[in-house]
From Swiss-Prot:
Record text about domains: The integrity of the zinc-binding domain in NSP1 is important for degradation of host IRF3.
The organism's place on the tree of life at top rank: Viruses
Protein name: Non-structural protein 1
Database matches in InterPro entries: Rotavirus_NSP1
Keywords: Host cytoplasm, Host cytoskeleton, Host-virus interaction, Inhibition of host innate immune response by virus, Inhibition of host IRF3 by virus, Inhibition of host IRF7 by virus, Inhibition of host RLR pathway by virus, Interferon antiviral system evasion, Metal-binding, RNA-binding, Viral immunoevasion
GO biological process, one term: symbiont-mediated suppression of host cytoplasmic pattern recognition receptor signaling pathway via inhibition of IRF7 activity
Family according to the record: Belongs to the rotavirus NSP1 family.
GO molecular-function terms, A-Z: metal ion binding; RNA binding
Residue segments, region Important for cytoskeleton localization: 82-176
Cellular component terms per the entry's GO annotation: host cell cytoplasm; host cytoskeleton
Physiological role: Plays a role in the inhibition of host innate immunity by inducing the degradation of key host factors required to activate interferon production such as IRF3, IRF5 or IRF7. Associates with components of cullin RING ligases (CRLs) including CUL1 or CUL3, which are essential multisubunit ubiquitination complexes, to modulate their activities.
Compartment list: Host cytoplasm, Host cytoskeleton
């Protein structure tokens, strides 16, 4: 069992405060929680194991045994995980509060050590100091933490994590915050704790302390779509489905600016127990709208593009072409269940075809053209440089004419009514016969921004907001979209 989990198991028997704070799921209890193949460290009990999704943020950071408590590091309730979670900027004073909490919950003194030794020796053949019997006394106090960057906030989940060398399949990365504190002071704390242990255990304690307090921080990982579970969605088959979030709260709401002060509540045991007795849960339905999910969807669309359509003469829109091996697209992919992506794909391809037909003498959709390789990138609006380069290459392929230092292309081929409306909306109420580079970029981006305006999107889904932020957005009625009514961003 993990050292931190062992310590919680044994120390929770000390007093009423510890029994409330150090409650973790035991490994010998089977729980009907979905196990995933994601390997990493459970933020609740710090053990390395298979992780399942959190019902508070949709990230994979909880093991099957701890999932029964539904704790999230973004909760308002000051449970142990929340008290170990800090937000940047972390000050020396904040770390002092964390260390004081550790000393309060996991004390080591002569009386306590003798109590644990006598408890172990009551069992047969346990006169030796085997490490597995005294694992709970071998947890040093370190500033080892797992970190993650969510929106503009960096979170640090302090704890004692074993097996740091193992594969990490989560977006959380190990950092050492020893430089934010005094190295000698931390050494002194641990040497004092260690002095109460038998010599054999002192050696192991020292080895663990230095290995977990002198390591180099790893670089931060970038979040990806696969880091978030789909299990919180109301309807996994609906692309506009809301996500159900559950957060643990308390009656006395703590402001986010006091985030790092949560660990200091443990000092007043009576007050802390009173606060925990007022705990309750809040449920929120939030939109999955964010750049991370949008980038993922458009990445799939870009791989399914049939660029030959822009040279074709098919009367039907791009997604409805049949019996043409060059233009027919496989529309059975789940991504096409999103009506917004269907509209965008059809409109962008129709507009590009109008530009090509207006400026280039082409024959049939079976022709092989150099511009094909840039067409998929026209849907990668989140990758600004790549998207701009694709538009420029398309524009140059159309052989623009230079007029007074500005290059123009023609637009005199028929477009569908929806594209016509979008062009008029962005070109002062009319459909121009000639377009320059900026006009082309403006129209193509507008077709995507009409439904996915990435300029004003969050980077990550709202499930990564703090409980106070969710509460505020809910009061403003800003947690959900109107996409189910087929209303666009513009409307």
């Amino acid at each position: 069992m993990a050292t931190f989990k062992d310590a919680c198991y044994h120390y929770k028997k000390l007093n009423k405060l510890n029994s409330l704070v150090l409650k973790l799921g035991a490994n010998d209890e089977w729980r009907p929680a979905p196990v995933t193949k994601y390997k990493g460290w459970c933020l609740d009990c710090c053990q390395y194991t298979n992780l399942t999704y959190c019902r508070g943020c949709a990230l994979y950071h909880v093991c099957q045994w701890c999932s029964q408590y539904n704790r999230c590091f973004l909760d308002e309730e000051p449970h142990l995980l929340r008290m170990r979670t800090f937000k940047d900027v972390v000050t020396k004073e904040d770390i002092e509060g964390l260390l004081t909490m550790y000393e309060t919950l996991f004390p080591i003194n002569e009386k306590l050590v003798n109590k644990f030794i006598n408890s172990v020796k009551q069992r047969k053949c346990r006169n030796e100091y085997l490490l597995e019997w005294y694992n709970h006394l071998l947890m040093p106090i370190t500033l080892q933490a797992l970190t993650i960057n969510l929106e503009d906030n960096v979170y640090y989940m302090f704890g004692y994590y074993d097996c740091m060398e193992h594969e990490n399949q989560t977006p959380f990365q190990f950092v050492n915050l020893l430089e934010k504190y005094d190295k000698l002071l931390l050494d002194d704390r641990n040497f004092h704790r260690m002095s109460h242990l038998p010599v054999i255990l002192q050696q192991e304690y020292a080895l663990r302390y230095f290995s977990k307090s002198r390591f180099l921080s790893k670089g931060k990982k970038r979040l990806s779509r696969s880091d978030f579970s789909d299990n919180l969605m109301e309807d996994r088959h609906s692309p506009t489905s809301l996500m159900q979030v559950v957060r643990n709260c308390i009656s006395i709401h703590i402001d986010d600016c006091e985030w790092n002060k949560a660990c200091t509540l443990i000092v007043d045991a009576r007050n802390y127990i009173s606060i925990m007795n007022s705990s309750y849960t809040e449920h929120y339905s939030v939109s999955q709208r964010c750049k991370l999910f949008t980038k993922y969807k458009f990445g799939i669309v870009s791989k399914l593009v049939k660029p030959n359509y822009i040279f074709s003469s098919h009367e039907s829109c791009a997604l409805n072409v049949h019996n043409c091996k060059w233009c027919q697209i496989n529309n059975h992919y789940k991504v096409w269940e999103d009506f917004r992506l269907r509209k965008i794909y059809n409109n962008v391809m129709d507009f590009i075809r109008a530009l090509v037909k207006s400026n280039v003498n082409v024959g049939h959709c079976s022709s092989q053209e150099s511009v094909y390789k840039y067409v998929p990138d026209l849907f990668l609006i989140c990758k600004t440089e790549k998207w701009s380069e694709a538009v420029e290459m398309l524009f140059n392929y159309l052989e623009p004419v230079n007029v007074n230092g500005t290059e123009y292309v023609l637009l005199d081929y028929e477009v569908n009514w929806e594209v016509r409306g979008l062009v008029m909306q962005n070109m002062d109420g009319k459909v121009p016969r000639i377009l320059n580079m900026n006009d082309t970029k403006k129209i193509l981006s507008a077709m995507i921004f009409d439904w996915f305006d990435t300029r004003y999107m969050r980077e990550t889904p709202m499930t990564t907001s703090t409980t106070n932020q969710l509460r505020t957005l809910n009061k403003r009625n800003e947690l959900i979209d109107e996409y189910d009514l087929e209303l666009s961003d513009v409307e």
